[in-house]
Amino acid sequence: MNLIPTVIETTNRGERAYDIYSRLLKDRIIMLGSAIDDNVANSIVSQLLFLQAQDAEKDIYLYINSPGGSVTAGFAIYDTIQHIKPDVQTICIGMAASMGSFLLAAGAKGKRFALPNAEVMIHQPLGGAQGQATEIEIAATHILKTRAKLNKILAERTGQSIEQIEKDTDRDNFLTADEAKEYGLIDEVMQPEK
């Protein structure tokens, strides 16, 4: 069961109830808190485009707590982040794994963050194939092309060599927030404001 909290905002015109995500959107905050599929990607892309239309100069904040998901859905979000004019700050809370870590690295350089106890996991794309040998060969060729594209982008976003990315993503590779900073996936580990 998915409960979405409601917040009440009082203004001089009365009270207004918002679901929490709509209220956060007013402050240019988008929450990616689930696996990434086409529906989630469409929602995130729509919010990014809406916020750009509202103000193309102000930063957008994308909070990520995601186990990853569909590569094509993730690329839809990634390409939109790169396409729109406002800088997108990415902040890892909890876990950014797989495509979640790819989107974490997609933020504007200098504006990619993780909380101190957040974890980041990188690996190669996963896939499966069945059917006739030719269908399996087509699927294998496609996943190898996808892996090469992901590795090239990760190398550009992190400053690591493609060879290093290939080595480090061969298996699940879990990083602490500090290790993610050292690797180049993020720029800073956020410290408590207290």
Swiss-Prot record:
The active site is at residues 98, 123. It comes from the Bacteria. InterPro entries: ClpP (IPR001907), ClpP/crotonase-like_dom_sf (IPR029045), ClpP/TepA (IPR023562), ClpP_His_AS (IPR033135), ClpP_Ser_AS (IPR018215). It is found in: Cytoplasm. GO terms for cellular component: cytoplasm; endopeptidase Clp complex. Coiled coil: none annotated. GO terms for molecular function: ATP-dependent peptidase activity; ATPase binding; serine-type endopeptidase activity. The keyword Lyase does not apply. Keywords: Cytoplasm, Hydrolase, Protease, Serine protease. It holds the Pfam family CLP_protease. CDD domains: S14_ClpP_2 (cd07017). PANTHER family: ATP-DEPENDENT CLP PROTEASE PROTEOLYTIC SUBUNIT. Cleaves peptides in various proteins in a process that requires ATP hydrolysis. Has a chymotrypsin-like activity. Plays a major role in the degradation of misfolded proteins. NCBIfam families: clpP, PRK00277.1, PRK12553.1. This is ATP-dependent Clp protease proteolytic subunit. The gene is clpP.
